[in-house]
From Swiss-Prot:
Biological processes per GO annotation: protein repair
Subcellular location: Cell inner membrane
GN (gene name): msrQ
Function text: Part of the MsrPQ system that repairs oxidized periplasmic proteins containing methionine sulfoxide residues (Met-O), using respiratory chain electrons. Thus protects these proteins from oxidative-stress damage caused by reactive species of oxygen and chlorine generated by the host defense mechanisms. MsrPQ is essential for the maintenance of envelope integrity under bleach stress, rescuing a wide series of structurally unrelated periplasmic proteins from methionine oxidation.
The keyword Iron belongs to this UniProt entry's keyword annotation: yes
Highest taxon of source: Bacteria
Protein name per UniProt: Protein-methionine-sulfoxide reductase heme-binding subunit MsrQ
Pfam families: Ferric_reduct
Keyword DNA-binding carried by entry: no
Homology family: Belongs to the MsrQ family.
Named cofactor requirement(s): FMN; heme b
Annotated transmembrane regions: 16-36, 53-73, 82-102, 118-138, 156-176, 178-198
Species of origin: Rhodospirillum rubrum (strain ATCC 11170 / ATH 1.1.1 / DSM 467 / LMG 4362 / NCIMB 8255 / S1)
Cofactor note: Binds 1 FMN per subunit.
Amino acid sequence: MTGGSVLKDRDRLGRIAVFVACLLPLVWYGARFVGGDLGANPIEAFTRKLGEWGLIFLLASLAATPARLLWGWTFPLRRRRMVGLFAFFYVCLHLLSYIGLDQFFDWGAIWADIVKRTYITVGMAALLLLVPLAVTSTRGMVRRLGGKRWIALHRLVYPAAVLGVLHYMLMVKADLSEPLIFAGILGLLLAVRLVPAVRRRRSGRAPS
């Protein structure tokens, strides 16, 4: 077996491992939901867990570049697209659970919630920002848009992540500890990305 084939096999195994790992939360909480093991309000708990994991995967996709900058890890970059698509997948399931299980497809009530409840308005805005990112995630779309335009478009992931964390914070009624942890992680990830850009800008300035 050649070195190239070994690397290909490792890459394939890595893709499979990440794919399976990303499905595990859905399997775990889906089984608990069906088995009636999610507390007194299983629909709310199931819907919330789907949203939490969507946010976790979104932050994980944002962590790929900081992992390379800080520790030289390239594996997260190779799996960033898959993890980002799973983030979108879980966010969509979060929305579908709210629409179908919580509201029973009562579109009038759903629209009223979007208009009147700030956390739902913010959550919908975050989802809408993620839609073009998911649609243009393929290599073919990168070629169609061109590298610069594609990169500019995919910077929408940052406001989407901020809105996702804000949605979580507004949704929680009492204990803000978990949303604040998410906010702290997002802040660190954004800070790590900003530091090299600031250094490049400063080094590019000619001394007066």
